[in-house]
Each structure stands twice: as structure tokens, then as C-alpha cells.
């Protein structure tokens, strides 16, 4: 929601500066994404004036002398060749001494014996090139004479952009944001001054609502003899531009103006294009189409699309977009104004169906205040009558009260409030906070009965009310109370799960990784590429379409973060994340199991570039080593805890460079290279490697205990053997470990060879045995016996040939 500070201060103007205003928004839970000064050109001495007299210059053809009143009794003559304006027209004048944006200073000049004591200003002269109107600036008749034009349009303004969360649709308007500031500063909001809209014509339109569940409230009004050619007042244009909306015409601009100020979408139809002058709110019929007004694309309507129609054709997709069959044109004189309340779920389904996310959808999907409809209709009517003249008919009001949102009544307990907050707020302070937020409060002993405002759909339970109280009271005002502890207090042990995860993070950080935190809501398209076999939990009301499902693994967030960095020329990436993943229990229900997982991702070079170090691209064995370094924390050698990897096929991973991870035959997760097809679709430019560990499976394994280091020397022996290529080196190592020889402390692979002198489909492995006793120095005979046991076992299991 982008808006100007000056517009907020028209509604509520507390004695705080800009920085304090930003802080108040932030502390109230409204995330300010950007705050900047209005990018306007500076000019000085430019004022509003009134033309008193126009006369032809006696000595020059096509030249006139304008006598204007520029305020303070200052009557001056200005010579101009532009004669498009009449007596009493309000204009913008640069007096003598005025400074224009280009640095020019206005001076008195003589033209054929007549003095010119200023200049009538155009938009381009003042650097306001975003206005398309040509000629001298003309202002409304109520513009104050002598007022500084820079101040009149509030050019000394700030633009604020706030990221509105899905639960705070009430803040998608100037009035909604002003309510927050008024509540924090205990100020009163201004009231909209609407002149009485007494009907002066009797024209109405019958409105038939066939689906009151989807549209429980519909208001309308007929306006006739509207002049659409009148330019939109500059103040309205400036407000729209500062909110990121380009002015179009007076009708559309006023509709957008009311939308931004009150948060209620207003639709305006050409009255003459409504067939038989009857409005229906119904579902679409087979074969119906709608031509969109923005790009003249003709779309076929899906069944069960809620439309606004006349007797013959659809006029609009309800709450989403209007068709050009009924849109206002330059020849329009009679219009029909419509405001409505639609069921948010209906609008969400419709915009997803047609992929049309309009400014109206933004409001309707989050829920608009059903009680503001009539105010918005009357406000739009009064503005149109004020600027476009014309006559208005009576309000047409169709309401199904049974289908409108109900006011929620919640009991707030003083005991629960104190328990959650941890400190005491006086009763009157609580009542004032809730009343200023629009709640109705009734005291009941030590408790309160609270009725929610019509615009707050997010307040459902007692905890919601408590969060509102502390939000406005101010988190920064929570008293600092020293913690009270007892020396006899029982120390609570930290769960092994937390300790082991913390240790594992330390290991990864030591290996050059950086920790990230991402949302549990992820992009469904990326997740489907990684896990096509699973159906994720879908959010009913997502923040956005690319955050609409719950994550099945941490890879989605890691890959998106990696892509973000890759697109900013960061090539060497090592990231990890821990968090909850939501795994469906079966494909037939929405039940999920929540699993704590630890995942990592890396790409780029194995080592940072250095003139003295030869480096290469990271590969499968690098990330496999990272996983092993974590699992070594749990590898208790004397209890036969064995880490091993099994080749596997997983949709997200390269079929030849992926493996399942096991510890003590317990499945822990996957490691490997992202599948080449996925890398291509996501435009990943280098090999990306990932791992994921199911932490809930790891924590049940006891961590390695500290043991005494033997003071006796180690002995090393190498065994070279030839085995078939399909036998993995890890199975050879595990077989040696499982023999159970006490003095065999370590077995590791040191060489793999294929080629000359090795039969086809065979390979040569060399493994190194580390032998050490805790009680004595091993004798050569003892060592030979261990070697014989190992070679005999390997020959028996794998039919190995020793070199």
C-alpha cells in the first residue's frame, strides 16, 4: 500500500514528525518497506491567482493583457499570448522574483510599452512533466487566492510504502492506516463532509441477486447528465500519482480515489449500455464471454463464475474486472455507480481462475468493511456531482443480512490478560485502547465483553484482543522487570535434539556454510519439480501465489535463495537451514506429520580462488563429506554405529550422483546433485548439490562419548584386492568393521584403480587398516592374525582376489 504522508495527515495529524510516524507504523505491526521524499522540482514564489480582466494588447496581435489578483491586495498585469481562459478563472502565477525549477528568476519586462509583472505558469514550466494537459494551469474555483502553489499541492511530502499482511485488509486504505495512527496517539479521525445527496431524479435500476451467499450486499445509484470531459482536479490527480496510479479521466479517477481513501471498490457502468436497465448478480451461463476493457481480449467464462450482468450479457466478473461492453467512454453522460460486498472466498477462486489480480481483488480477497459501502457510494456521488455536475437518483440497496459477516463478541478476562502480558495495565487504559480501535467494550466485573469492529475480520479469539492491546500500548513500553530466581531451582535440561542440532550447525559453519531462514510457504511450481510424487498442504489464503503451499523439504527455499544469489553474481555458495517440513500422511487426507530437518546446498568452487591453491568445481564427494562430518558426531565406534550411503533414484536428484543416507541401518535422508532437467528449467548455471537429514530420526541415536587415547603406538597395513565393479567400497569397509576385532580401530579407502592389468568389469581397491591396542604394543604375530582374518572374510564375502 503506497500513499503520501500528507493524505494521512488530512485524516489525523498528531504532533509527531515523519520519523516518528514511520516508527509508529512499524511498532504497530505494519512493515514499512520504503519511505522517501517526494521527488518534485523545487520552485519558489509561485502562487494561486484569479483573473480579474482580460484585454487585447493595443500594439501586438494575438497578445492579451491579463489583470490578476495574486493575493494580499496585489493586483498585477501579465502579458500572454494564451487566451483560453475567462474572467474569474483561477490560475498559477509566478510573481516578480519567483524562482523556477530551471533556476530562472522572473523579472518585470516591458513589451511594446506595457509592463508584464509576472508569468502565467504551465505544468512544463514548473517541471511537472507527468501532466499531459497543455497550456496555462487552471485550478478549481475554490482554490485560495495568494496560496503558495507548492504548499497547495503539498509538494513537501513523503511517500510511504507499507507491506500489508493478509490479515490486515482493513489497512489497504488511507482511512484504515489513519485509524491506526489515531489509536496510537489517542486522536480523533476527521469525518468526511458529504453534502446531502437528496435525489433530484427518480431513475433507479432493478437489482436481482441470485446468489446472496456470494454477494450479500449490493448498492447502486443512477447519475445523469455527467460531464466526463472536465479535467480531474489537481489535488486528486496528485494523490493518485503519489499512490502509483496514473490519472485517466474524471470518472475513473474518482472511483480510484474513493478506493484508496476508503478501501471500497467502486464500479461505474455506462447507464445506456445496460440492456433493459436491469442488473443481475448471478453465475455465468454456458458459452458466455466477456471482452476485457483494458486490452480488448475476449475471454470465455468458466462455469460458476460470479458475474454482474444485464438481461442479455455479462457486464463484469464480480469483484475482479469490468468488461468493455458497459465501460465508460468519452461520449458517456449517464452512469450507474455500484458498490458491493462479496464473499472473499468467491473472489479468491475467481481471480485464480482467470489470473486477474486487480486492485479490487486485493481488497475483496482480504475482506472489506461491509458497513462502509453506503458511505463510499455517497462519497463518490458527491465528488462526481461536485466536479462533473449532473443529477443523482435514489440509492438502491439490496442486503441479505443472513449472509453478511457477523460481529464477533469475545470475553476478555483480566486474569488471562495479566498472565500473557506479565504486567498490569489499568482498566481505563485497556478500555481506551480498544475503544480507539473501534471495539465496543462493556465492563463485566473484572472482565470485559468486547465486540469487534465491522472492518476487523482477523479478530476471532481472546488472544487476538490481547495482542491488539499490547500492540497499541507499545512493546517498547513493557516494563523491565528483573527475573526472580531461586538458588534451589531445579535446572531444566536442554533436550538432546537442540544440543545435537546446535553442534551440527557449528560443524557446518566451520566448513564454510552460512545459515539461512526461509518461509514455510513455498512456490508450488518449484516444489512440484522437486517432489512430483507428493501432494503438499495448500494454503486457503496465501500471501501470494508463489507462497501458496507448505514445504515438503527445505530444498525449495535453499534453491530459491541460491538462485537469488546466483543472479547477483555470487558463484560460490554454501548454505544450510533447519526447520519444520510438512509431510502428508497419505494422499486421501489433509493430515500432515511435522518433521524437523536439516538441509544444505552448495555450488561453485571447492575452495576460494587463491594464487597458491589449485581449485576445481565442487562435486558429490564434497557434500558427502559435509554430511559425514555431521554424522560423525553420532558415530560411536565401539558400538558399531556405521555411516553408509546407498545409490538411489529420487526425482529431484541426478540418477547417477545421488544416494540415500544411513546410520546404523536407519534411513536419514538424501544427498546428491540436483537433476539436470530441474537445473535447466530453473536456469541454474552450475552444478548444485544438496543434502537433507531427517533430524527426528537422528536424535534417538546417542552421541559419541569421549574415550581415553591409547598411549601405545599405531600400526598401519594396506590390503589391495580386486572385486567386481558393482560392489561398493563402503560395503568392503563395513564388512571389515563388522568382524569385531577389538584392536582394529579404523578402516578407510585410500585408492581405486581400473585399467591395465585389471579384468573388465572389475576394479582394484586399496584399504588402510589402523591397528592399536589400549593395553600393550601389538606384536607382529598379532598384526598378521588380524590381517589374515580380514582377507579371509573379504574373500568369502566378495570372492576377492588379493594383489
From Swiss-Prot:
Subcellular location: Cytoplasm
Pfam families reported for this sequence: B3_4, B5, FDX-ACB, tRNA_bind, tRNA_synthFbeta
Annotated FDX-ACB domain residues: 710-803
UniProt GO BP: phenylalanyl-tRNA aminoacylation
Reactions catalysed, as given in the entry: tRNA(Phe) + L-phenylalanine + ATP = L-phenylalanyl-tRNA(Phe) + AMP + diphosphate + H(+)
Cofactor or coenzyme needed: Mg(2+)
EC number: 6.1.1.20
UniProt keyword terms in alphabetical order: Aminoacyl-tRNA synthetase, ATP-binding, Cytoplasm, Ligase, Magnesium, Metal-binding, Nucleotide-binding, Protein biosynthesis, RNA-binding, tRNA-binding
One cellular component (GO) term of this entry: phenylalanine-tRNA ligase complex
Domain tRNA-binding: 40-150
GO MF annotations in UniProt: ATP binding; magnesium ion binding; phenylalanine-tRNA ligase activity; tRNA binding
Binding site for Mg(2+): 458, 468
Details of cofactor binding: Binds 2 magnesium ions per tetramer.
InterPro entries the record matches: aa-tRNA-synth_II/BPL/LPL (IPR045864), B3/B4_tRNA-bd (IPR005146), DNA-bd_dom_put_sf (IPR009061), Fdx_antiC-bd (IPR005121), Fdx_antiC-bd_sf (IPR036690), NA-bd_OB-fold (IPR012340), Phe-tRNA-ligase_IIc_bsu (IPR045060), Phe-tRNA-ligase_IIc_bsu_bact (IPR004532)
Residue ranges of domain B5 in the record: 405-480
Main location: cytoplasm
Subunit structure: Tetramer of two alpha and two beta subunits.
Family in the record: Belongs to the phenylalanyl-tRNA synthetase beta subunit family. Type 1 subfamily.
Name of this chain's protein: Phenylalanine--tRNA ligase beta subunit
